[in-house]
Structure formats: C-alpha cells, structure tokens
Amino acid sequence: MKKELLKKIYSEIKKYDLIYIVRHIGPDPDAISSQIALRDSIKYTFPDKKVYAFGASVSKFKYIGHIDKSMDYDYENALVITLDIPNKSRIDGLNVDKFKHVIKIDHHPFVENFGGIEYIDEKACSTCEILLDLINNTRLKMNESIARTLMIGIISDSNRFLFNPVNENIFFKVGNLVKKYKLNLQDIYSSIYMKPMSEVRLMGYIASNMKVTKNKFAYIILENDIVNSFNADASSASNMVNDFSNIDEFVVWLFVTYDAKNDLYKVNIRSRGPVINEIAAKYNGGGHKFSSGARVKTMSELDDLIL
C-alpha cells in the first residue's frame, strides 16, 4: 500500500467539482462495486460535488446499485477516475484520451499509462480492496451501504477468498469492516451467489458438453439459442466460468458467448496454474495471470485462440 499516493488521489478528488468514474467493458461485481462505492463515498464526503458512475448497466448486478446515464462530457474540467482497467481499449463509457485530468486505480498487471496519476497494486485481491485502503487512509467517508458494496467486490473478485493474492491483511481489513458496520455476511453472500434453477440447469448442460483435451484444457462455445433455451442470458452464462474452478479433470478452462449487440465473441478464461493473461492480450483482452478475458470478431480468430 502506498499511503502517500492514496493521499495524493484524495487531494485530486477534493479539487474537482465534476467527477466521472468508469470501469471495464463486460463488468464483474468488483468493477461495478468499485464504481458505486467510490461514487457514493465521494458524494457522502462532498455533497456538493457532481459524481457519476458510467458504463453499460447489467441486469444481473442491479443488486449492487445503480449506474448513471451517460451525458455530454466536460472534457476540460472533469476528473476521470478509471477503476479495474489496465488498458484503454477496455474502458466502458468514454474515451479517456479526450480528458485532461485522469486517475487510474487498478489491481491488474500494468499494460499502459492513462496520462495521469496511476495507482496499481497487484497484491490487492480486488479494486474494492484498494478503495477500502483509500477510504481508510484519507478523509473520505463511509457508511454501512458503502461498506457492503465494497464487501461485494472483495468477496466476488477473490472468489470467497480462494483466489490469490489473498493474505492476512485482507482478513484484518474485512474483519474491521464487518465489525464497524455490523455487516450481514449471510445476506451479502446470498446477494452474490443465489441463482435461479434455470441457471443451475444451464450449468448442468455446460458440464455435460464441455470438451476436455488430454492436456487438461476444457472449453465450450455457448450459442445464444442454447443459453436462451434455459431462460438465461449471455452475461450470466459467461460468469458461470468461476463455478468450474475445482474440477480435477482440467486446469485451464474457457467459456465463449456471443455478444449480439457488438457482433463479437466474448471469451472468459480461468486457470489453476498456467499463466493466461498474455494469451488473452493477443486477442483484444487481458486481465490477471489466472483470470482473464478476450474478445474476438470471427470464428477463425476464436479457433486460433482455442487451438
């Protein structure tokens, strides 16, 4: 943790009356939770500031909070804070190159500079953990709602504290958070992991139809008509990749879904050993060493990635 840099970020936040907070395309709970928690903390601390969280809303994650509608941007006077994004091409909601004032906060390996203050902590289990550090080490305020939102991001991105990096520090921080704000962990876990029977049936289909190679690599291409037949959507199907992390027969697994709106294939990749983010980076993606995503336009590109 770099306390002086956290204080510098707080000083920058204090300067600006207009703040835009953005995260990556195809968001997960950590990305959305970090947006909402930071927006709400800044507004709670500075009620007169105009603070917005931008990006496509995802119905599956409405329980976390609301995303603001896009607007005409003030490129000269606004401060942009990017969260959970290592590269510009994955920013959802705006073109960061058009803005004069930018802060980047992330826990992924460094890919490129965004042109302003950069706070990257690869030892953090989530971007929400970094924001917890930011609030704990500055005069930003927190309430029970903000604390709950941060917990959602921390729990989900660490997969219930199973994924590295997880160490004694995060348990100390989370313990204090639960104690101070009397958080209901059972309620939080239910919000994250409760799912309808239709999704469980889809998981059964996936388990029955995944292809597994002799090299312990598993993959499945989930066409939308199959997903829809289970009353699920592509986003929900894609996020099920995390539910297959403890299967002995494979160490790397990959889910493919089709994004009809953007006419491309979304690829979620997970690993229990081999480093995968370097491969994902070659296909318009990236992420962590053992948890990454990619986006490809054609079936030929998809075949290259898989094979």
Name these PLM-found stretches.
Residues H107-K173:
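Short alpha-helices
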